[in-house]
Amino acid sequence: MFDAAPIKKVSVVIPVYNEQESLPELIRRTTTACESLGKAWEILLIDDGSSDSSAELMVKASQEADSHIISILLNRNYGQHAAIMAGFSHVSGDLIITLDADLQNPPEEIPRLVAKADEGFDVVGTVRQNRQDSLFRKSASKIINLLIQRTTGKAMGDYGCMLRAYRRPIIDTMLRCHERSTFIPILANIFARRATEIPVHHAEREFGDSKYSFMRLINLMYDLVTCLTTTPLRLLSLLGSVIAIGGFSLSVLLIVLRLALGPQWAAEGVFMLFAVLFTFIGAQFIGMGLLGEYIGRIYNDVRARPRYFVQQVIYPESTSFTEESHQ
């Protein structure tokens, strides 16, 4: 058996994108929750290219006396998971907790995650109770969770909730991965020996709007499908085989019917032939599109461009910053 190392310091990583209304309350509540831990702690706020005053508020919070807040400013918007990975590269804690900035997942749940991780778990996930989202968001989340569970074989109930805890070795291992499209909860579970979930409260969004539009959810679905498995390519091969066999069988049937009923019948079957042709063409375009998704993602991985560019890092009790690029 492997004994988990004791948790001496907790790092809370929070990606921020146009959350100026919620930031003061977020910082206050997260700070209060961390102070109750009885451990060393830090909060890392990552500005993901916000166009409002989020970055200024973050910098101000880092520069306050006795601040525990590290502000990381990206030069533009790279997406939630890339921003979290940028935060991971600057943490110093033994346990790292991710949290959304919209306050739908209460920061007051942080001590419960730390206590559960103290039992020896590598990853502690959460399941949102009484979700305060729209019916569309709930339905999309159920489909995504079902897809992930079927693909990975990991019976985790709520991959969409970013309130999660990871031990430092899991974080270090994820940082060594270089996929361009990264879905952190799934990647962490691949490396975790012991993972569990706990139920948490879920609140209605008080400030601003959700940053996940319909098209971003569709893109997330594509990311999950193409990053997790090659099963769609195998299904595509199976579909192609079925269509080929069906087309050959139909051709034989048409020849037999022509011989049996004469050429007049064949002329009357033109529309059926067009229908079959369009079916084949449609299947080919579906296959080409799916194949293109895989090839495009392989191309992005081969180019090995950085996931993000860190423009500034503001540490507590210091107004200095560094400029650097990270993978």
Curated annotation (Swiss-Prot):
InterPro entries: ArnC_tfrase, Glyco_trans_2-like, Glycosyltransferase_2, Nucleotide-diphossugar_trans. It catalyses: UDP-4-deoxy-4-formamido-beta-L-arabinose + di-trans,octa-cis-undecaprenyl phosphate = 4-deoxy-4-formamido-alpha-L-arabinopyranosyl di-trans,octa-cis-undecaprenyl phosphate + UDP. It holds the Pfam family Glycos_transf_2. One of its GO terms (biological process) is response to antibiotic. It comes from the Bacteria. Pathway: Glycolipid biosynthesis; 4-amino-4-deoxy-alpha-L-arabinose undecaprenyl phosphate biosynthesis; 4-amino-4-deoxy-alpha-L-arabinose undecaprenyl phosphate from UDP-4-deoxy-4-formamido-beta-L-arabinose and undecaprenyl phosphate: step 1/2; Bacterial outer membrane biogenesis; lipopolysaccharide biosynthesis. Belongs to the glycosyltransferase 2 family. Catalyzes the transfer of 4-deoxy-4-formamido-L-arabinose from UDP to undecaprenyl phosphate. The modified arabinose is attached to lipid A and is required for resistance to polymyxin and cationic antimicrobial peptides. Residues 257-269 are periplasmic. Its EC number is 2.4.2.53. It is a multi-pass membrane protein. The gene is arnC. It is found in: Cell inner membrane. This is Undecaprenyl-phosphate 4-deoxy-4-formamido-L-arabinose transferase. The chain crosses the membrane at residues 236-256, 270-290.
